[in-house]
Amino acid sequence: MRTKSLKKNKINVITLGCSKNVYDSEVLMGQLRANGKEVTHEATAKDEGNIIVINTCGFIDNAKAESVNMILEYADKKDKGLVDKVFVTGCLSERYRPDLEKEIPNVDQYFGTTELPQLLKALGADYKHELLGERLTTTPKNYAYLKIAEGCDRPCSFCAIPLMRGSHVSQPIEKLVKEAQGLAKNGVKELILIAQDLTYYGLDLYKKRNLAELLEALAAVEGIEWIRLHYAYPTGFPMDVLELMKREPKICNYIDIPLQHISDSILKSMRRGTTQAKTTQLLKDFRAAVPGMAIRTTLIVGYPGETQEDFEILKEFVQEMKFDRMGCFAYSHEENTHAYLLEDDVPDDVKQARANEIMELQSQISWDLNQEKVGQVFRCIIDRKEGAHFVGRTEFDSPDVDNEVLIDASKHYVKTGEFVNIKIIEATEFDLYGEPA
């Protein structure tokens, strides 16, 4: 007599949004694996799993739309019997759970950003405290994100992050060092430190800004060769970090410091706690303290009340400062933020035109800066082979958002996951082409 075999569940974790969501998904998958669950993050047509977890983003309109569309897609697949269960977590779920439960009720359950144990229980797993940050990384083997804090205490008028992530909570240095040691044992060479605000690190735990002390502890971890800083805040920046960056070779001469705008009237309305003069001086201090450092920033155009004069001030600032890397976004009018009380008075087409103009300006700046690199030799980490090229990065470039170094695979072989000295032979606005030196 033949018996029907029981289908083994396979859980597919789909991640939308920022690197902090990537980290959260990796923690979730690590917990699931420790519970003996089969888990994947590869959504393929042949085998995408029968239980779906969607880790959503709820930051701005485009991200929210992408998350909603993904939920609808898998809710429809569930209705058609193509998947068995659908669970939703992350920022969109945290922010809009009642609305989502009403509008898309065929999702099995919604969870917020702090409900990992509850999500695991719904997936038939137990939360294991002893894992201490162990996770199933989804990035190339040579780098990993390290989330040093959660939430944010800044009062920025346009930002909904505190609504979804709560107040700032730093992770203890000893916990982060242990996590870094585990990553290094698994082959990670580059740590990318992330938080809503790196510069606030330690104020809650240690009653002082403690980022430099954390960096020193992480730099002592054997196997870690690069440490990269993302998402610093211009107000209250701990300058001892720059002193450490200059003398500690493991800390990349790179910082991501979203400035958002530079016009004093817009900065005041945004509640950024700084001015054009203070910001300009801070950036000059950065470059004086660490000559050659790469500065990445993010700007917002079309904020309520932004005049053509405000925009011209911003353009002049971009031209003057010549940022190494930049992103620019059209303002998104977010419910329950302070700025939502203001009239969203800049037309969408004007917002987008201004964003395009800023990025065109930055493209020329990037072209000029990259041409200066031709003929120079840089130590690069090789992330992957893609098509006809090996793809790497210098210490001045972060994954996914910055320049890449492309090496012709038909002419040269370099080992992925390793450091190689590369001579730059050609450059475009956002890519460098090189060969082993």
Curated annotation (Swiss-Prot):
Catalytic activity: L-aspartate(89)-[ribosomal protein uS12]-hydrogen + (sulfur carrier)-SH + AH2 + 2 S-adenosyl-L-methionine = 3-methylsulfanyl-L-aspartate(89)-[ribosomal protein uS12]-hydrogen + (sulfur carrier)-H + 5'-deoxyadenosine + L-methionine + A + S-adenosyl-L-homocysteine + 2 H(+)
The MTTase N-terminal domain, residue ranges: 9-128
Originating species: Flavobacterium johnsoniae (strain ATCC 17061 / DSM 2064 / JCM 8514 / BCRC 14874 / CCUG 350202 / NBRC 14942 / NCIMB 11054 / UW101)
InterPro entries, alphabetized: Elp3/MiaA/NifB-like_rSAM (IPR006638), Methylthiotransferase (IPR005839), Methylthiotransferase_CS (IPR020612), Methylthiotransferase_N (IPR013848), Methylthiotransferase_N_sf (IPR038135), NA-bd_OB-fold (IPR012340), Ribosomal_uS12_MeSTrfase_RimO (IPR005840), rSAM (IPR007197)
Domain TRAM, chain residue ranges per copy: 371-437
Gene that this polypeptide is encoded by: rimO
The protein, known as: Ribosomal protein uS12 methylthiotransferase RimO
List of residues binding [4Fe-4S] cluster 1: 18, 57, 91
Family: Belongs to the methylthiotransferase family. RimO subfamily.
GO cellular component: cytosol
Primary location: cytoplasm
Pfam families: Radical_SAM, TRAM_2, UPF0004
GO biological process, one term: tRNA modification
Cofactor(s) essential for the protein: [4Fe-4S] cluster
